[in-house]
Amino acid sequence: MSESVRTNTSIWSKGMLSVIVAQFLSAFGDNALLFATLALLKAQFYPDWSQPVLQMVFVGAYILFAPFVGQIADSFAKGRVMMVANGLKLAGAAGICLGVNPFVGYTLVGIGAAAYSPAKYGILGELTTGDKLVKANGLMEASTIAAILLGSVAGGVLADWHVIAALVACALAYAGAVAANLFIPKLVAARPGQSWRLSAMTRSCFSACVVLWSNGETRFSLVGTGLFWGAGVTLRFLLVLWVPVALGITDNATPTYLNAMVAVGIVVGAGAAAKLVTLETVSRCMPAGILIGVVVAIFSLQHALLPAYALLLLIGMLGGFFVVPLNALLQERGKKSVGAGNAIAVQNLGENSAMLLMLGLYSLAVLVGVPAVAIGIGFGVLFALAIAALWIWQRRQASY
């Protein structure tokens, strides 16, 4: 069966569709669980400062396990790694349902997510190749964003009805992801027989970082995706602060709806990138990255809901068009140098470090009293300048 998968590189093959379904259910569970667990914290009268800590333990798991998850993904069949990782998520969600401390349960989900990510992206390069890889990434990103959109809404709606019911729904989503993983054919491990000593694995991760950062194309991809996802997480929190100030709306639903517009836009942008950008024309995505920052700055000046929706939809479209080709470039080049699993693990380390850094800077700005609108404008301008600098640097590297 694995042989048939290697010869059938269609993005509509059984193996590829199983990956996409598993990814949708897993991401659906991740996002529904976040809102369901936040509702649980409120119901159990945890202090407000505990809510961002919940996100931090999730992100921290990615950073802590980065030296190890890439080797795990490359040492075993990636479909089976995905299944075990979703099993960890299932255990974490089920534990929260059964009364385990929510921070402990959510940390277990974060560990599962950290192990899952290199395998889910690395397997794309084993199921398809070349320009089809960009299209496969488009499908993956589209399914992920659709799951983020639906999972967030479902988690919030179900939690308003019954918190435990929402948590059970999350566990069922993870169980469905485990079942979908069973339909992914068992492929040959990319790099079997590596050392499992912690010191050796840490050195291996460090070595992968050095190799990828020494290559102009992969360094370009790592910086671009890190900036994008760091900015994306920061924008989510910025919206919560910005809506009451700029729009005069104090409910909890409006920031969620605005975030949903970004998610819808990313689906559209990812689809456009799959059609218009190849591995040889990755630089086409860079103007979209610069425009993200420009549009964020313009968005921050709005005082009406309709233009805010439209601009966030545009931000999402630009984001999807920007990030999908960069992901594909890293997978293709990383697979040949350090293995796809190690490449994605290094990418996760960079992206999550960028998230912590940007959220830290954002929190500092809020702490010293910078107005929300000013934060948005400054954030947009700095992001546009950062992507422009990255593009200039990439063009200079390409000319050597």
UniProtKB/Swiss-Prot annotation:
CDD domains xref list: MFS_MefA_like
User: Which top-rank group of organisms is this from?
Assistant: Bacteria
What are the alphabetically sorted keywords of the record?
Cell inner membrane, Cell membrane, Lipid transport, Membrane, Transmembrane, Transmembrane helix, Transport
User: What cellular component GO annotations does this protein have?
Assistant: plasma membrane
Bilayer topology reads: Multi-pass membrane protein
Q: Which Gene3D superfamilies does the entry mention?
A: MFS general substrate transporter like domains
Indicate where this protein resides in the cell: Cell inner membrane
Q: Which GO terms describe its molecular function?
A: lysophospholipid:sodium symporter activity
Q: Where are the transmembrane segments?
A: 19-39, 53-73, 91-111, 139-159, 164-184, 227-247, 257-277, 281-301, 304-324, 352-372, 373-393
Question: Which family is it part of?
Answer: Belongs to the major facilitator superfamily. LplT (TC 2.A.1.42) family.
Q: What does this protein do?
A: Catalyzes the facilitated diffusion of 2-acyl-glycero-3-phosphoethanolamine (2-acyl-GPE) into the cell.
Record-given protein name: Lysophospholipid transporter LplT
